[in-house]
């Protein structure tokens, strides 16, 4: 047998059958659910008189609609309260593990599963959420799915899928100070495009990823979907194993040793054949900020907003639309642009190390006058850990609001929203029109440290200059 990639190995191990259509019926090892995409799926089960096939392989939490300030029940938003109640009823009826607000384990679904040790190498993972690719950081194959597919996994613990091609994305070298995992993935998406990964799984490889901690790797894999890929992964290694060891749902004792041995075996082989290979140099990546209305419209902080004639013809129409919506002029510097709101959080950048890096920037400074800045931990565990380290005090002393765990201003499904055409510096993953709650609200994606730099200067800034 020829040398294989991790993707091929995990896919083959989870193949139930090849269907007449050519699709694969793929077993799903872990199903994560939340309040937004699960109610309709449970209703479909009820209509057909079906039960959840493997409730022990399903884990639920509430994240999208959660208020990050007043969490008193019933929620002020009646639709949010309805979704919350539906999740409570459905998980109880089907004996599904549920992490509610105040449990100590609630949070964004893509934050809580890794921190509890639920996400492990070699798994297939599905969730009714675009950013399920996050879990690929562990060497898992993880897909975001739609509501009808949520129903299928609940009922049959499997999905009918077309097998993906595999593109190896190599990044080698050391990242300069002030350059983070978020900058790496924004750079990759900028270069390959938001449609560049369609039909692919992305394998991230090279010394730059090897040097990253697990939370940084999760940031990279999280935004694979923004680059058009269905999933993205990094081969498991000693960093992966060290992160998982001792976590609640990780194997223990002899089972741990056996698991690590197996996890090593599923990594892509050195001479594995890929459908495509793309290489980047870490030294070419600087703090990166989006200027437009797609995650692919990014530039280094030292660059101006691109002019129309500098872009590929295929990118010019969306660029023209972006100039108008974002109120930017071609050729203008992004650095120095005044910001209104600064948001640190999300499933991309709401983990402890993200908050630590932002706190280094904020410490000893004050949020600029007229800027609203707030920090939303990705989970109750992250919040507790951050408070134990005194990060909440650093942020609050600098004038940031310190909130409860949730998805918050990443999307407009809770009270945290932009007003009018406010400009947001955000550590989240999407900068689409209206994404943060206002039909004319504008979003600049950047690393948490860059958001902190924007908050204290009141404008888009180079974090390297703030850090000195």
Curated annotation (Swiss-Prot):
GO biological process: L-leucine biosynthetic process
Name of the protein described by the UniProt record: 3-isopropylmalate dehydratase large subunit
Enzyme class: lyase
GO molecular function: 3-isopropylmalate dehydratase activity; 4 iron, 4 sulfur cluster binding; metal ion binding
Subunit-structure text: Heterodimer of LeuC and LeuD.
Gene (name only): leuC
Biochemical pathway: Amino-acid biosynthesis; L-leucine biosynthesis; L-leucine from 3-methyl-2-oxobutanoate: step 2/4
CDD domains tied to this protein: IPMI
Names of the cofactor(s): [4Fe-4S] cluster
Reaction equation(s) it catalyzes: (2R,3S)-3-isopropylmalate = (2S)-2-isopropylmalate
Family to which this protein belongs: Belongs to the aconitase/IPM isomerase family. LeuC type 1 subfamily.
Assigned EC number: 4.2.1.33
Keyword Ribonucleoprotein: no
Organism expressing this protein natively: Synechocystis sp. (strain ATCC 27184 / PCC 6803 / Kazusa)
Function description: Catalyzes the isomerization between 2-isopropylmalate and 3-isopropylmalate, via the formation of 2-isopropylmaleate.
Residues binding [4Fe-4S] cluster, per UniProt: 347, 407, 410
NCBIfam families: leuC, PRK05478.1, PRK12466.1
Coiled coil: none
Textual note on the cofactor: Binds 1 [4Fe-4S] cluster per subunit.
Keyword line: 4Fe-4S, Amino-acid biosynthesis, Branched-chain amino acid biosynthesis, Iron, Iron-sulfur, Leucine biosynthesis, Lyase, Metal-binding
């Amino acid at each position: 047998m020829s040398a294989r990639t991790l993707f091929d190995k995990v896919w083959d191990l989870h193949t139930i059958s090849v269907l007449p259509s050519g699709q694969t019926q793929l077993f799903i090892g872990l199903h994560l659910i939340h309040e937004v995409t699960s109610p309709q799926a449970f209703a479909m089960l009820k209509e057909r008189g079906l039960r959840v096939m493997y409730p022990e392989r399903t884990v639920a939490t509430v994240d999208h609609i959660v208020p990050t300030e007043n969490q008193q029940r019933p929620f002020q938003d009646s639709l949010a309260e309805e979704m919350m109640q539906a999740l409570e009823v459905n998980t109880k009826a089907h004996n599904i593990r549920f992490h509610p607000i105040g449990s100590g384990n609630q949070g964004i679904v893509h934050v809580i599963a890794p921190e509890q040790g639920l996400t492990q190498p070699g798994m297939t993972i599905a969730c009714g959420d675009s950013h399920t690719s996050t879990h690929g950081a562990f060497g898992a194959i993880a897909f975001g799915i739609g509501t009808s597919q949520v129903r299928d996994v609940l009922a049959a613990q499997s999905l009918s899928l077309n097998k993906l091609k595999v593109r190896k994305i190599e990044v080698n070298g050391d990242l300069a100070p002030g350059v983070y995992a978020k900058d790496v993935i924004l750079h990759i998406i900028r270069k390959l495009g938001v449609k560049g990964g369609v039909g692919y799984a992305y394998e991230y490889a090279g010394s730059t990823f090897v040097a990253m901690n697990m939370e940084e790797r999760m940031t990279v894999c999280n935004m694979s979907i923004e680059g058009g890929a269905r999933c993205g992964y990094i081969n498991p290694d000693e960093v992966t194993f060290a992160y998982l060891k001792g976590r609640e749902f990780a194997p223990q004792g002899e089972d741990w040793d056996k698991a690590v041995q197996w996890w090593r075996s599923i990594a892509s082989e050195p001479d594995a054949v890929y459908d495509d290979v793309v290489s980047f140099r870490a030294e070419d990546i600087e703090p990166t900020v989006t200027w437009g209305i797609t995650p692919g419209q990014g530039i280094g902080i030292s660059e101006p907003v691109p002019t129309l004639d500098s872009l590929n013809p295929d990118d010019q129409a969306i660029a023209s639309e972006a100039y108008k919506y974002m109120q930017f002029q071609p050729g203008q510097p992004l650095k120095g642009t005044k910001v209104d709101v600064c948001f640190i959080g999300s499933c991309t950048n709401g983990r402890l190390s993200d908050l630590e890096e932002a706190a280094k920037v904020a410490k000893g400074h004050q949020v600029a006058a007229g800027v609203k800045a707030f920090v939303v931990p990705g989970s109750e565990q992250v919040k507790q850990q951050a408070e134990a380290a005194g990060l909440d005090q650093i942020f609050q002393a600098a004038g940031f609001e310190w909130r409860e765990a949730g998805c918050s201003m990443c999307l407009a499904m809770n009270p945290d929203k932009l007003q009018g055409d406010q400009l947001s510096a955000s550590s989240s993953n999407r900068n689409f029109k209206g994404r943060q709650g206002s039909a004319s609200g504008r979003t600049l994606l950047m690393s948490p440290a860059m958001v902190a730099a924007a908050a204290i200067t009141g404008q888009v800034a180079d974090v390297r200059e703030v850090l000195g």
